[in-house]
């Protein structure tokens, strides 16, 4: 499974050491407005919204309130990441929902929070699957998936939902999935 070209950028930005270093390096004066609304809509804490806003401000060199592809390239360079046009395009394409060629704060917040949530879910799924069995060829039943899910992930799923997940992971149309197939399916989400 090839890694998305923008993942390296988002992973580096979200790494606490990098974020703290960037925030200390550049003092941001402006405040984020509508913190409560944004925190509720994106299901994150106010502190996370403020942290993401500070990082956004660091990237917005010209103070326009948006991030351009050249500002993304500059940040990639500062993070020590390959600044190829393809990587910059991948970051812009994954974030610029409006299609105007710029990333505004809400688009940036949406991209960052979705990456954070996805990495949390993937870690939860890995833990969940390790509770079922370490044999990657073991077949998972819907009932096993429901039990393991409830023990590791912060939400519950029904047997019907578990069946749908297994069906999606099933690459051979058998009506069942191995742990390996399930992991592969989760990595492509």
Swiss-Prot record:
Keywords: Calcium, Coiled coil, Metal-binding, Repeat. Residues 47-82, 83-118, 120-155, 157-189 form the EF-hand domain. Ca(2+) 1 binds at residues 60, 62, 64, 66, 71. It comes from the Eukaryota. Pfam families: EF-hand_7, EF-hand_8. The keyword tRNA processing does not apply. Ca(2+) 3 binds at residues 133, 135, 137, 144. The keyword Calcium applies. Residues 31-54 form a coiled coil. One of its GO terms (molecular function) is calcium ion binding. Ca(2+) 2 binds at residues 96, 98, 100, 102, 107. InterPro entries: Centrin_CML-like (IPR050145), EF-hand-dom_pair (IPR011992), EF_Hand_1_Ca_BS (IPR018247), EF_hand_dom (IPR002048). PANTHER family: CALCIUM BINDING PROTEIN. This is Uncharacterized calcium-binding protein C50C3.5.
């Amino acid at each position: 499974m090839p890694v998305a070209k923008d993942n390296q950028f988002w992973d580096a930005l979200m790494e606490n050491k990098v974020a703290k270093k960037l925030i200390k390096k550049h003092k941001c004066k402006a405040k984020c407005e509508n913190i409560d609304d944004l925190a509720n809509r994106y299901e994150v804490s106010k502190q996370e919204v403020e942290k993401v806003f500070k990082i956004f401000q660091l990237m917005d060199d010209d103070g326009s309130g948006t991030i351009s592809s050249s500002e993304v390239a500059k940040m990639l360079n500062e993070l020590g990441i390959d600044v190829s046009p393809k990587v910059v395009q991948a970051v812009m394409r994954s974030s610029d929902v409006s299609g105007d060629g710029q990333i505004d704060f809400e688009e940036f917040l949406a991209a960052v929070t979705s990456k954070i949530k996805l990495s949390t879910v993937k870690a939860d799924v890995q833990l969940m699957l390790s509770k079922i069995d370490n044999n990657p060829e073991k077949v998972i039943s819907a009932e096993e998936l429901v039990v393991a899910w409830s023990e590791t992930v912060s939400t519950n799923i029904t047997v019907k939902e578990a069946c749908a997940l297994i069906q999606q992971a099933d690459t051979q149309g058998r009506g069942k999935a191995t742990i390996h197939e399930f992991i592969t399916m989760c990595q492509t989400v």
